[in-house]
């Protein structure tokens, strides 16, 4: 593997559309380079007002990033300020990661609840 390959940061989302729970995430797969910014989107199940974001690094369990309820942040995991999120009036949510690092390569999961 050449050193140029180590500069890529791979971000993946679960599924290729609606997942079994009815949550929709986009984009489904994303490749960025270090230093770039990424925005991940989540549409919750209809009627759900709470959205939570998780990061799952290969070989590890999911780690909590954020929870929003009715557009207010209700919880934040131990992640740097490069990670931010927000929730919109329709209860959809965005997760933003700035200045990507190789360690940000992971599966990013969104869950919704009442």
Swiss-Prot record:
It comes from Homo sapiens. This is T cell receptor beta variable 5-5. It is found in: Cell membrane. Residues 22-114 form the Ig-like domain. V region of the variable domain of T cell receptor (TR) beta chain that participates in the antigen recognition. Alpha-beta T cell receptors are antigen specific receptors which are essential to the immune response and are present on the cell surface of T lymphocytes. Recognize peptide-major histocompatibility (MH) (pMH) complexes that are displayed by antigen presenting cells (APC), a prerequisite for efficient T cell adaptive immunity against pathogens. Alpha-beta TR is a heterodimer composed of an alpha and beta chain; disulfide-linked. The alpha-beta TR is associated with the transmembrane signaling CD3 coreceptor proteins to form the TR-CD3 (TcR or TCR). The assembly of alpha-beta TR heterodimers with CD3 occurs in the endoplasmic reticulum where a single alpha-beta TR heterodimer associates with one CD3D-CD3E heterodimer, one CD3G-CD3E heterodimer and one CD247 homodimer forming a stable octameric structure. CD3D-CD3E and CD3G-CD3E heterodimers preferentially associate with TR alpha and TR beta chains, respectively. Glycans are attached at residue 90. Disulfide bonds join 42-110. GO terms for cellular component: plasma membrane; T cell receptor complex. InterPro entries: Ig-like_dom (IPR007110), Ig-like_dom_sf (IPR036179), Ig-like_fold (IPR013783), Ig_V-set (IPR013106), TCR_beta_variable (IPR050413). Keywords: Adaptive immunity, Cell membrane, Disulfide bond, Glycoprotein, Immunity, Immunoglobulin domain, Membrane, Receptor, Signal, T cell receptor. Coiled coil: none annotated. GO terms for biological process: adaptive immune response; cell surface receptor signaling pathway. The gene is TRBV5-5. It comes from the Eukaryota. Residues 1-21 form the signal peptide. Its main location: membrane.
């Amino acid at each position: 593997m050449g050193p140029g390959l180590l500069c890529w940061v791979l971000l993946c989302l679960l599924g290729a559309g609606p997942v079994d729970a009815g949550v929709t995430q986009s984009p489904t797969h994303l490749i960025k380079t270090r230093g770039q910014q990424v925005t991940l989107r989540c549409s919750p199940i209809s009627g759900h007002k709470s959205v939570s974001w998780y990061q799952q690094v290969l070989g590890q369990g999911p780690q909590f990033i954020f929870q929003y309820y009715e557009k207010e942040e209700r919880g934040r995991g131990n992640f740097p300020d490069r990670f931010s999120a927000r929730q919109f009036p329709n209860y959809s949510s965005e997760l933003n990661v700035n200045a990507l690092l190789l360690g940000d390569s992971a599966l990013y999961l969104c869950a919704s609840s009442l």
